Amino acid sequence: MFLTLRRWNRVSKDVWCLLCISLSVMATPVSACSRVVYRGPDGAVVVGRTMDWEQSLEVNLWAFPAGLERDGNAGARSLKWKSKYGSVAATCYDKLVADGMNEKGLVVNVLYLSSSVYPQFDGTRPTLSIGAWAQYVLDTFATVDEAVTVLKDEPFQLGVLIMPGGHAGTVHLSLADATGDSAIFEYIDGKLVVHHGKQYSVMTNDPSYDQQLALNGYWQEVGGSIMLPGTERPADRFVRASYYLGEAPQTSDEREQIASVFSIIRNVSAPIGAVHAGQPNVAATLWRIVADQKRGVYYFELTDTPNIFWVDLSKLDLSVGQPVRMLPVEDAPVMAGEVSSRFEKQTDFQFMVGSDPGEEK
């Protein structure tokens, strides 16, 4: 105890400033999704994430082939594109893509960020619904570097959307590829901020990513074996995820890799009953996803069912000309094991409409 107190007494003024930032986060709406990137021996890369919300998001899994004609569904200048790569994606309400992995091993995760501010449409660039942001990346890029090279120049503008219940769908985007490269995309004060590099292996929600990194730096000074913050606040989850990711075993055993990532994201999951009135994002974890990018396997776990099931992308024909297929998840019988054969042909959906952020002010 004496040594611990001495360490606390040596905390610099800068560190106390970080504590003030941490306390200020408590006064803001708290978001509750988390994402980690595990890198193991022999080129293993595994991404895990949680999805937390106050009500059902009516999640389903979709298998999209290459060669699909797409529309960004964001007004007269809506972006049009053709999918270059096939992918498996998790959708909300069958109107927006929240998560996915493409056939090249690129994983995209959408997480809530209440402090996002998007620029209003300037009338000169194509527009894209935020509900289609993740799918555009999955359709278009094979690596994080490819995506950053194009997206940093903002070739399109994002149209905001309103979620069922009237809540704004303000988000940030994380990418990781089969090499372990990683990137975070945020809109802060109307400007795109990109964090690119393998060091960006953990993401939660508010505050902005640079502040999350600063807060995590403080807790690294304290030392996770001495104390870890335990609430469901994003900053606390960021610290716990970072610490336990650093403790994860470096193993070539596939089962242990997947189990390690599941154990980390379960640690940062919010319990059933964690609902705060007026804050839909401070809520129980609805589901968890782990993506094995080296082997092309997409694992899924619903909080209220006892089993994990997974999709081996190599068992899905995602080539040009193949049909769009869907696997019902939330209202389906309990599933376990590999489920690629259970996808059924389905008519493609239209992305949720994205509108000019200027109209929301």
Task: Name the predicted role of every residue range.
Residues 46-48, 107-110, 174-176, 184, ...:
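Structural recognition of the beta-strand scaffold that forms the well-ordered cores
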Residues 31-46, 159-163, 167-169, 178, ...:
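C-terminus-biased signal that marks the final domain/tail of proteins
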Residues 1-11:
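N-terminal secretory signal peptides that target proteins for export/translocation
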Residues 15-26:
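Bacterial N-terminal signal peptides
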Residues 39-42, 102-104, 176-180, 186-191, ...:
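Short acidic-glycine loop/turn motifs at beta-strand connectors
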Residues 124-160, 254-263, 272:
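Proteins synthesized as precursors that undergo proteolytic processing into mature forms
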Residues 32-125, 158, 336-337, 341:
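A contiguous strand-loop segment
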Residues 153-190:
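Catalytic cofactor-binding cores of redox enzymes
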